[in-house]
UniProtKB/Swiss-Prot annotation:
Disruption phenotype: None seen. An isbB overproducing strain cannot be made in the absence of the sibB gene. This is Small toxic protein IbsB. Part of the SIBb repeat region (formerly known as QUAD1b), encoded on the opposite strand from the sibB (formerly knowny as ryeD) RNA. The keyword rRNA-binding does not apply. Keywords: Toxin-antitoxin system.
Length: 18
């Protein structure tokens, strides 16, 4: 459950970078 949250956070942070 924790890993999923971390993955989602990383995706949200990385997506606007593009």
């Amino acid at each position: 459950m924790m890993k999923l949250l971390i993955i989602v956070v990383l995706l949200v942070i990385s997506f606007p970078a593009y």
